[in-house]
């Protein structure tokens, strides 16, 4: 019995150890790189000068950590082939509108993505970080300043003008 009591006491004491402290270092918001490669994209009759995201690293970073998006700025994400896509608002500090485009540049779906508040210090712990799905095959995604899709009256099926051939050839 003394052995059992000793084991219970040991288990109780060892389970009370504090977890090591965790240092949370928030990401520092950044401004767009003025030297980033851009391309002109026309949405709803309005020209935008969008940064390119052609490879996995660029697509993963996307517009994360930005404090602002220029009125005519944003990013175009190009993929090698049409596929089901899903984007999240990871480390995003401003609202972003997303347009998913098929291989011909037609709008498949759009979303007004809102800033996600951290839960427990981490945005990814917030269930609202779940993906915004393309709901169909898409080869491109375009992200612009929040509110512009509605302001421009963009709808599913609309054509977005972008250098399709170049983007398809360069997507990795």
PLM region descriptions:
Residues 12-15:
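C-terminal motif of bacterial Sec signal peptides marking the signal peptidase cleavage site
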Residues 17-172:
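Compact, glycine-rich, soluble single-domain proteins
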Residues 1-3:
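Bacterial N-terminal signal peptides that target proteins for export
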């Amino acid at each position: 019995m003394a052995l059992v009591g000793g084991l219970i006491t040991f288990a109780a004491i060892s389970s009370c150890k504090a977890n090591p402290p965790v240092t949370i270092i928030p990401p520092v918001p950044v401004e767009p790189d003025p030297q980033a490669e851009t391309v002109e994209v026309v949405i709803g009759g309005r020209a935008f000068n969008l940064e390119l995201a052609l490879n996995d690293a660029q697509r993963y970073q996307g517009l994360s950590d930005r404090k602002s998006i220029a009125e005519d700025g944003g990013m175009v994400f190009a993929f090698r082939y049409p596929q089901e896509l899903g984007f999240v608002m990871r480390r995003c500090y401003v609202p972003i509108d997303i347009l998913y485009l098929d291989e011909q540049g037609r709008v498949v779906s759009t979303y007004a993505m809102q800033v996600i508040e951290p839960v427990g210090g981490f945005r990814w712990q917030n269930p609202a970080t779940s993906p915004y799905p393309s709901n169909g095959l898409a080869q491109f995604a375009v992200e612009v300043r929040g509110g512009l899709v509605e302001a421009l009256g963009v709808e599913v099926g609309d054509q977005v003008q972008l250098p399709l051939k170049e983007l398809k050839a360069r997507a990795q």
